[in-house]
Swiss-Prot record:
Membrane-topology descriptor: Multi-pass membrane protein
Outcome, altering R738Q: Resistance to EMB
UniProt enzyme class: transferase
GO MF annotations, alphabetized: arabinosyltransferase activity
Bias (Low complexity): 817-831
Protein EC: 2.4.2.-
Listed name of the protein: Probable arabinosyltransferase C
Transmembrane segments: 28-50, 232-251, 264-286, 341-360, 373-392, 431-453, 466-488, 530-552, 565-582, 586-608, 620-642, 657-679, 700-722
Job of this protein: Arabinosyl transferase responsible for the polymerization of arabinose into the arabinan of arabinogalactan.
Length: 1094
């Protein structure tokens, strides 16, 4: 190796060649780079394999030596091992006439649960036999008389992933059995028959007999922490990687080049465009729509601290989010301050501002002089960036950090190419790896590294002549692998592999060739394919297409830097291809392109300027394509997810203002194409002028030549105005914008302060004026309305059924998400007017008459006119502004009316006016019809119901209960912040003050309430959380009975905001089980048993 300085002319011609002594001065740096880099990489790679301290948990029963039921819902559904021993004499409590109601000696699920036999273990009396049933399989059966006989010693049961076995020790098979005289035992294998455990339940009471034992090893493989060895290795790995990067930097300085400043000049200054972008982002932070998964992620983050790891709370049996959980861990730390939406999304706002700063300060200057000096390019970049960011990245999902990570990775690579140094490459590897493991869509970040392989290989080749390959590659290898340390800091390699195999097996896990599903959703009239989302993607594709076309035609876009421009285009293409390999296909994944969209927008703006695209015809055709993209985008709804949709104009219809916007835009497209044809056939010059244009003409030309900038900013304006208008039109009712602005004043509980709950609907019943309570409902006229004129099953019709829903069916093949307690049924005892209909919302049949028009067989016309009911005074009406009637059936709103009258009018048999009810619920289930008391004149003192059912179709019928004025309290006051709550994943961000039920050591906390979104959202998200997917619904439906509580949204009475359910345990006296905890060291390859998959 040369020891003398290279000639100055060589330094000027080839800056990456040596200009300094590379011998003694850099020998230490070379050794450090090799040793520290290789050791750092080895330690990082070894991190997943190093041992951890696992907290073990054992569920033992009986507890306190008595027959007492305990709750222990396992988040993984099953124990790794289960051993049960039951003395035969313990079954004596099930025998005899005095124990007729006692049937279960021991079970892992409450016997009352609908799927108890299918999923759990029950040792129960069936007729005169004692039967052990495991997942709907009678494993072993013995006559109760033999069990209580002298020869029977005990029943033993063991369950492992590969087999389950049970035996009545002391008893033998009868003469008619397959093996007469053999021990009475049963066994099943070939399938995972381990029963689901939500506790240990029994119908017996009193002291437990000696020898009774239930021992379950809870699956706590993810409740682990690093051992001192692993902690030391991680610290050393990070330190060695840092040392290797320092050594690489020293080797980089051997080129003798002056250090370039890290930040561009005047990076801190702001212009008018910067101010506008900042203003839009900040305002959108308050009024803008959020993403559908914000509640999902927020709940995971909130629960993780107590749980000890970042579990996928809503699916996949509580397995961890790793390797994609590090970003969520940061959100968990952030949530320590507040869980309010404006606070939790503050990092997202910071990422948005950083993205724009990088685009405007780093990306645009690197793309060439034409891009740097073009105002059209800057405005198009800003418009494209906002058009993608606003609808796709204003939440807690990882797309914002991935979008930023892609930009920063590209900037690091470009710095490496520009300076011929390798430290920026190592930094790019770290940023790229962190971006990759921010979420599944982080796979898009690999493009930033792949597109620069050519120039980076050249740099490496030049420098390897002086330092060798290993001193240069080892630090980069350490940088590329160091992210394994935070990802596997407290988890093992085997555990993560099993978790990811489970997720793939349970699904959803779509293949690369299913990518068309993402685009099908993009073109559906739903929030997934809304105007904003559709335009964002189509505009990005258009910008990519024109940039590629111009680059292919002319080698590069005139006036741009060829290398950076090609790499930006390459990154985008590779990102689209990489997205094919994500396991789910949702349109919110396009949020990762926000930064690239701004960069491509700048390129596309220059590509269609007069200097680059001289043909007026071609520029006009491009403008026509932009208008067509607008037309195609407006052929959808202006829809947003859940509460973000409240009050938004055209949220359920195509935008229309006197005429259809999509049709008008399509007609405009045709006109612009005709103009292009005119340029082609008539005025086919290149459009160049020799005269100096006026200032007005120059500005007009700039606008005309920037159709993409105009379109993007029009869409940004449309989105901002839509959500601002929603907040204004909703006021004083709840909206996202109002809630976020109120949070600045300390009101941070969101929707919980505006949802009004009616705990006791019986208290608000209006009193009949003359007729007895039992007869008042039909006192005026009752033709074919009878107390039992209601079908036994009034389950609500599904509101949605989309392609792919079959992946999320419950065991009955039905889409879950209905409101329990509203599906009807019958009762054993008749109500006050002889009806046996089961009433919803805790209505008392002893005080609530009901009449319906349905009958078995041929239907007949039916009419109902109730007696008069007394209205409260005007002062009382002001405190309770709503009148409600609980109804069921399928009918039009005009068929059920409320009439009012004064005392004099009522006495004369006349009414003073009438109105229709607002029907918010889902037919034909029970729901609350609503009427605002403000619509009733203050002089009215009485009301009555009038119903007319002239439709003879069997599915068309009406059932009514008496009117009432609800006595309500806020959900925040009823549920509070202390009770454990099952927050559906769509509602988590809207209810930040409610405490989601936790889990620790593999056992879930038992929730007392469940909060659901609107019915559309409930049907969409409930299947994700069900038993098939390993979610909490598979636990709560076995442990508790859900009952819907009547609720209303303040000042927005006719809104389906969602539902509140009270969860009542099947065994109210059951207490949380005490677990026996321990600690054991496990290697990174240890596995206790396969994870349950169904």
């Amino acid at each position: 190796m040369a020891t003398e300085a290279a000639p100055p002319r060589i330094a000027v011609r080839l800056p990456s060649t040596s200009v300094r002594d590379a011998g003694a001065n850099y020998r230490i740096a070379r050794y450090v780079a090799v040793v520290a880099g290789l050791l750092g990489a080895v330690l990082a790679i070894a991190t997943p394999l190093l041992p951890v301290n696992q907290t073990t948990a054992q569920l033992n029963w009986p507890q306190n030596g008595t027959f007492a039921s305990v709750e222990a819902p396992l988040i993984g559904y099953v124990a790794t091992d289960l051993n049960i021993t039951v003395p035969c004499q313990a079954a004596a409590g099930l025998a005899g006439s005095q124990n007729t109601g006692k049937t279960v000696l021991l079970s892992t699920v409450p016997k009352q649960a609908p799927k108890a036999v299918d999923r759990g273990l029950l040792l129960q009396r069936a007729n005169d036999d004692l039967v052990l049933v495991v997942r709907n399989v009678p494993l072993v059966t013995a006559p109760l008389s033999q069990v209580l006989g002298p020869t029977c010693q005990r029943l033993t049961f063991t369950a492992h992933a590969d087999r389950v076995a049970a035996e009545f020790v002391g008893l033998v098979q009868g003469p008619n059995a397959e093996h007469p005289g053999a021990p009475l035992r049963g066994e099943r294998s070939g399938y995972d028959f381990r029963p689901q455990i939500v506790g240990v339940f029994t119908d017996l009471a009193g002291p437990a007999p000696p020898g009774l034992s239930f021992s379950a090893s809870v699956d706590t493989r993810y409740s682990s922490s690093p051992t001192p060895l692993k902690m030391a290795a991680m610290i050393l790995g990070v330190a060695l990687t840092g040392a290797a990067l320092v050594a690489l930097h020293i080797l980089d300085t051997a080129d003798g080049m002056r250090h370039r400043r890290f930040l561009p000049a005047r990076w801190w200054s702001t212009g008018g465009l910067d101010t506008l972008v900042i203003a839009v982002l900040v305002w959108w932070h308050f009024v803008g729509a959020n993403t559908s998964d914000d509640g999902y992620i927020l709940t995971m983050a909130r629960v993780s601290e107590h749980a000890g790891y970042m579990a996928n709370y809503y699916r996949w049996f509580g397995t961890p989010e790793a390797p994609f959980g590090w970003y969520y861990d940061l959100l968990a730390l952030w949530a320590h301050v507040s869980t309010a939406s404006i606070w939790m999304r503050l990092p997202t706002l910071a990422m948005a501002l950083t993205c724009w700063w990088v685009i405007s300060r780093e990306v645009i200057p690197r793309l060439g002089h034409a891009v740097k000096t073009s105002r059209a390019a800057a405005w198009t970049a800003a418009g494209m960036f906002l058009a993608v960011w606003l609808p796709l990245d204003n939440g807690l999902r990882p797309e914002p950090i991935i979008a930023l990570g892609i930009l920063l990775t590209w900037c690091s690579v470009e710095r490496a190419v520009a300076t011929s140094r390798l430290l920026p490459v190592a930094i790019a590897c770290i940023i790229g790896a962190l971006t990759l493991f921010s979420g599944p869509t982080g796979i898009a970040s690999i493009g930033a590294l792949l597109v620069a392989i050519g120039p980076l290989r050249t740099i490496l080749h030049r420098r390897s002549r002086r330092f060798g390959v290993l001193p240069l590659v080892a630090p980069i290898l350490a940088a590329a692998t160091v992210t394994a340390i935070p990802i596997f800091r407290d988890q093992t390699f085997a555990g993560e592999i099993q978790a990811n195999l489970l997720k793939r097996a349970v699904g959803p896990s779509l293949k690369w060739f299913d990518e068309h599903i993402r685009y099908e959703r993009l073109f559906m009239a739903s929030p997934d394919g809304s105007i904003a989302r559709r335009f964002a993607v189509l505009a990005l594709v258009l910008a990519l297409a024109v940039s590629v076309a111009m680059s292919l035609r002319k080698g590069r876009i005139p006036g741009t830097a060829a290398g950076p421009s090609r790499r930006i285009i390459g990154i985008t293409i590779i990102s689209f291809l990489a997205m094919m390999f994500t396991p789910t296909k949702w349109t919110h994944h396009f949020g990762v392109f926000a930064g690239l969209a701004g960069s491509l927008g700048a390129l596309a703006a220059v590509a269609v300027t007069g200097a680059a695209m001289r043909s007026r015809r071609n520029r006009t055709v491009f403008a026509a394509v932009v208008v067509f993209v607008l037309a195609l985008s407006f052929a959808s709804v202006n829809g947003w997810w859940y509460v973000s949709n409240f009050g938004v104009p055209w949220s359920n219809s195509f935008p229309k203002w006197r005429w259809s916007l999509t049709t008008a835009l399509l007609e405009l497209t045709v006109l612009v194409l005709l103009l292009a044809a005119w340029f082609h056939f008539v005025a086919n010059g290149d459009g160049r002028r020799t005269a100096r244009p006026t200032r007005f003409r120059a500005r007009l030309a700039g606008i005309v030549q920037s159709p993409l900038a105009i379109a993007t900013w029009l869409l940004v304006l449309f989105e901002v105005v839509s959500l601002t208008q929603a907040m204004i039109s909703q006021y004083p009712a709840w909206s996202v914008g109002r809630s976020n602005l109120q949070a600045l004043a300390g009101k941070t509980c969101g929707l919980a302060e505006d949802v009004l709950v009616e705990l006791d609907p019986n208290a608000g019943m209006l009193a009949p004026v003359t007729a007895p309570l039992a007869d008042a409902l039909g006192a005026g006229l009752s033709e074919a309305f009878t107390p039992n004129g209601i079908p036994a099953d009034v389950t609500a019709d599904p509101v949605m059924e989309r392609p792919g829903d079959r992946s999320f069916l419950n065991d009955d093949g039905l889409i879950t998400g209905s409101e329990p307690g509203t599906e009807g049924g019958t009762t054993a005892a008749p109500g006050i007017n002889g009806s046996r209909a089961r009433l919803p919302y805790n209505l008392d049949p002893a005080r609530t008459p009901v009449l319906g028009s349905w009958r078995a067989g041929v239907q007949v016309p039916a009419m109902l006119r109730s007696g008069w009911y007394r209205l409260p005074t005007n002062e009382q009406r002001d405190r309770a502004p709503l009148l409600v009637v609980t109804a069921a059936g399928r009918f039009d709103s005009r068929e059920v009316r409320l009439q009012w009258a004064t005392d004099e009018q009522a006495a004369a048999g006349h009414h003073g006016g009438s109105m229709e009810f607002a029907d918010v619920g889902a037919a034909p289930a029970w729901r609350n019809l609503r009427a605002p008391l403000s619509a009733i004149p203050s002089t009215a003192t009485q009301v009555r119901l009038v119903a007319d059912d002239q439709d003879l179709a069997p599915q068309h019928w009406i059932a009514l209960t008496p009117p009432r004025i609800p006595r309500v309290r806020t959900l925040q006051n009823v549920v509070g912040a202390a009770d454990p709550v099952f927050l559906d994943w769509l509602v988590g961000l809207a209810f930040p003050c409610q405490r989601p039920f936790g889990h620790q050591y593999g056992v879930d906390e038992t929730p007392k309430w469940r909060i659901l979104p609107d019915r559309f959202g409930a049907e969409a998200n409930s299947p994700v959380m069900d038993h098939n997917g390993g979610g909490p619904l598979g636990i709560t439906e076995l442990l508790m009975r859900a009952t819907t509580v009547a609720s209303y949204l303040k000042d927005d009475w006719f809104r389906d905001w969602g539902a509140l359910q009270r969860l009542t345990p099947y065994y109210p006296d059951a207490q949380p089980a005490d677990l026996n905890l321990g600690t054991v060291t496990r290697s990174g390859l240890w596995s206790p048993a396969p994870l349950r998959r169904g």
